[in-house]
Amino acid sequence: GLREMETCNGVAMVTDDTQMTIYTAQGLLYAGKKHCDYGNTVREVHKSYLRWIASLLPTEDVFSRYESMYPREELERNELLENGANPGLDKKMCRGGSTFRALLSGQLYSVSNPADEGVRCGTTMRSAPVAIYCYKNPSLAFRLGRDCAAITHGYASAYLAAGVMCMVIARLINGSEMEEAIEESLDYLKTQKDGEELYAVLRKGVDLSRHPSEKPLNDIQTIGLGWRADENLAIAFYCCLRFGRDVKSALLACVNHSGDSDSVAAVCGNMLGAYVGEEGLPSEIVESIQFKELLCQQANSLFSCAVSSLPSSS
């Protein structure tokens, strides 16, 4: 299996997970700049996702499907790609699935108006910026993470998993230990409608980390393959708790299993990054990442404009 970061000409190329994370962050930054209320914050993230999919599918007239919802000229303004910025960010890296279908539907889905499908981890792998934007209020991080995930995924365990992950990261930013952040977030999940299935899967990952076998990959296979959002987050919990601040070992366990390894590693890395900080991350990984400057700039900007509350939409 992998032992070191794979690079191309010294650059560790990102996947669609990072693409969508960047567009999530950009939507939140627009919302912050406009001082949006809660509902319009979700809409700014939705608009950002539409810009993302339009950049990947230039032959599809994505924006015409939303003419009754958003001004076309606003959707067409994509600062991430203006004047040749961030080359490679518009490279299609995934087959589509639930996320593509929802974004091409002409609708804005929500928890109360759910998409027809969507159990997979397209929710968790893109949602970390929500946690930074809402780190001052972990409950708000949960709610906004959930609702931004429901833009594309209609299955409760999928959008709730994004909420749980955002709450964990928000707690970590505030100085909680990993186990404390996870357990408190699981307690919160128990109060949420339709959270029972997700809770059981996440609890399995946590419990396995406390009584691990000699081979992490065996434990990971017991949890699942990570394609589903609930299994994805459960494996990430297991790796974070089993390896603690040993970031490299945790990420190696994520990327060397036979399932959706890049997305599991993305979610695990998001949580560990919040836990150990930049100084605790292996320098050989950090320095080689594609779009590193953009990612750092977005994270710093989100932190600077972070909110403790968002007014309800009128």
Segments (PLM) and residue ranges:
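Structured, active/binding-site neighborhoods that engage oxygen-rich ligands
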Residues: 1-314
